[in-house]
Curated annotation (Swiss-Prot):
Cellular-component GO terms for this entry: plasma membrane-derived thylakoid membrane; proton-transporting ATP synthase complex; proton-transporting two-sector ATPase complex, proton-transporting domain
Organism: Prochlorococcus marinus (strain MIT 9301)
Record keyword Membrane present: yes
Record protein name field: ATP synthase subunit c
Entries under SUPFAM superfamilies matching the protein: F1F0 ATP synthase subunit C (SSF81333)
Family under the similarity heading: Belongs to the ATPase C chain family.
Gene Ontology molecular function terms on file: lipid binding; proton-transporting ATP synthase activity, rotational mechanism
Source species taxonomy: Bacteria, Bacillati, Cyanobacteriota, Cyanophyceae, Synechococcales
UniProt function note: F(1)F(0) ATP synthase produces ATP from ADP in the presence of a proton or sodium gradient. F-type ATPases consist of two structural domains, F(1) containing the extramembraneous catalytic core and F(0) containing the membrane proton channel, linked together by a central stalk and a peripheral stalk. During catalysis, ATP synthesis in the catalytic domain of F(1) is coupled via a rotary mechanism of the central stalk subunits to proton translocation.
Residues annotated as transmembrane: 7-27, 57-77
Quaternary structure and partners: F-type ATPases have 2 components, F(1) - the catalytic core - and F(0) - the membrane proton channel. F(1) has five subunits: alpha(3), beta(3), gamma(1), delta(1), epsilon(1). F(0) has four main subunits: a(1), b(1), b'(1) and c(10-14). The alpha and beta chains form an alternating ring which encloses part of the gamma chain. F(1) is attached to F(0) by a central stalk formed by the gamma and epsilon chains, while a peripheral stalk is formed by the delta, b and b' chains.
NCBIfam families referenced in this protein's UniProt entry, alphabetically: ATP_synt_c, PRK07354.1
Site (Reversibly protonated during proton transport): 61
Alphabetized UniProt keyword annotations: ATP synthesis, CF(0), Hydrogen ion transport, Ion transport, Lipid-binding, Membrane, Thylakoid, Transmembrane, Transmembrane helix, Transport
Length: 81
């Protein structure tokens, strides 16, 4: 593998992890804000809101894990070599 392909793979892996973490991070912050506001308005619905929040956190976190998997593939099982 030549040096340009190797360097591009490292940069792409960094971008995959970085950009893959920004979106879910912002989404989790917005979801938590909405959940806290919802619980403050309707304390009796806390259990339902919390369950939905945790499920949505799991879906958002899976996007970050997909970015990590792409980065690991680019670094260790490079398809471009």
């Amino acid at each position: 593998m030549d040096s340009i392909t190797s360097a591009a793979s490292v940069v792409a892996a960094g971008l995959a992890v970085g950009l893959g973490a920004i979106g879910p991070g912002l989404g989790q912050g917005n979801a938590a804000q909405g959940a806290v506001e919802g619980i403050a308005r309707q304390p009796e619905a806390e259990g339902k809101i919390r369950g939905t929040l945790l499920l949505s956190f799991a879906f958002m976190e899976s996007l970050t894990i997909y970015g990590l998997v792409v980065a690991l593939v680019l670094l260790f099982a490079n398809p471009f070599s």
